[in-house]
Each structure stands twice: as structure tokens, then as C-alpha cells.
Amino acid sequence: MKVVWSREDELTWAPFGPAMAIDLAADLDERGEVLAWRGEVWSNGHTMRPGRAKIPTLLAASQLARPFDRPVSVDPPFAGGGGSQRNAVPGYDFPALRVECHRVLEMPLRASALRSLGAFANVFAIESLADDIARSRGEDPVAWRLRHVSDPRARAVIESVARRSSWGSARSGEGFGRGIGWARYKGAGAYCAVVAEVELTHEVRVRRLVIAADVGFAVNPDGVANQVEGGAIQAASWTLKEAVRFDRTRVADRGWESYPILRFSEVPRVEVEVLQREEEASVGAGEAAQGPTAAAIANAVRDAIGVRVRDLPITAERIAAATLAEEAQTA
């Protein structure tokens, strides 16, 4: 027997990346310094992979004449990186912090692992607020980060991308923005920092990504660079375009013709520096760039137009909505 799923089957019935909602707040003193950091995360579980549960997790198991119950997605243990919790704890030297994660058990669509799990959304959110705090003080975003990071390896990737991107140089023109984001994957894995340069016309175009990665001892530096570059391009697509569109009855995108995804003509110039650490243990490179890339692009958009977009993907419609919301707040 041979079973072949069509492209429509894959796009409409396969599990999707979990939805996430993140609420962050920081207590500041009269000088704008962080006294405490608070975060709450709501999300589906981030894995429903076959072989990890006591009952079958494949779709067909729930469609049999005598069906198995469809299991609820779970989060991997936090000690192994977690799911929705992944990178929910910021990598900054704050005096106090509290982070809570809530697993949403029921949603209309099946969810399972998407590359980097919760790190993509968590780093996007954390680095967005970090940038806003720095700007509220009138402080350079790179300088603010370096002032709140004591880990020398984290500082090294931030300093690398700042130097190679000519951070602080003059703007290239109207609609140009530059932003930075960084994280240590899972809080214990690879370090990655990204500077994004964007141009806004009728949509956001990422023109350049400058990346530094520290994976410990890089056995194959070219392979590491390829993994980081691929992850960054994929993250750019998620950040600007990709989303599951559905109505009350079905998933709307049933083929690549309508699904919003980054095209070859939209792929930015990507520059990757691998910081070799022969004295350190090797760690994975494949998921380090996702969160920092999203954060860098979002912060670059904020730099270009002065408006914070808090919902992904960053489409023209969401930029317009964020602009109207900000104007209403200041009116």
C-alpha cells in the first residue's frame, strides 16, 4: 500500500506552528533603568511528534472507523530547552525578573514543532521591548545592550555585528531603518546577533542581514554559516509574510500560488561571521538565527517609521493599524 499526500493535503491538514501571545512589562526608575522585568506567555504546546506519546499522534489515527483520541500538543521539558518557554527568559542582567508560561489546551487547528519553537516569538518580543526602553532613554540600542550584558560571548556577537554593519553610520535615505536583535538559543546553546537593514515603500523589504554566530567549536564553519544563513532567510519570511489564513470552515491557502512566502527576488544580502571557539563545546547552529532575525527586522521597521509593530507578520496592513493605534494614544 502506498499513501501519497497532495500539496493541498499538506498545507491544509498538517500541524501548524503554534500561535503565541506574549505580554511583557518592565519597571523603570526615574532614570529609565530597569528595576524588574515581567513576562507572560500563552501558547499551544510545541510538539505533537510521532513516537513521543502513548497513543498515535498521526492525523490518520483520528480518522479510523474506531478512532484514537487526538492528543493535545505538549511542551518539551524546560531543562531541554522547553517549547513555549524557550528563550522566554531574557539574557540581560536585570535585578529581578518573573516569567510565567500558560499552555493553551484547545485551539481550532493542530499545532506542533516549528523551527526554533517558542524562541522565535519570545526573542522578537523581548528584543522589541529592550529596544523601546533604550530609545525612551535616548540611548543607542547597541550601547544599551552591551551595558546590560556581562557574558563575554554574548558581547562578542553583538560587537561583531555592530562593527561589520557600520552601526551608527548615517542613514541611507527616507524609509531606511536599521535594527539589532540577539539571543543565546535555549539560554544554553548558540549565541547569535543580527543587524537588519530595511527599506519601506509600499511594503517592508529587507535589504541586508549582518549576522554573528558563536556555536563553540565550529567543526565545519562553512556548514555553520549555511545553517545560520538559511535560518535567517526563513525567519525573514515568517516575519514579513507567513501566516495561516483560515475562516470558520477551512484553511484558505491550498497551494503555493496563494500562500504568502518570501520569493527569491526578495531574499536579502546575508553576511555571516562564525566566531570560532575551539576551547568550547560544539552546539547546534540550525535554530540560532530565527529569533534574533525577527527582532532585528522589527526594530529596523521601528527605526524607519517610528512606530512599533507588535503583531507578526509585519505587513502593510499591520503597519497601518499600528500607526493608527499610536496616533490614537497620543491624541
Predicted region positions:
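Cofactor-binding beta-sheet edge motifs in enzyme active sites
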Residues: 1-331
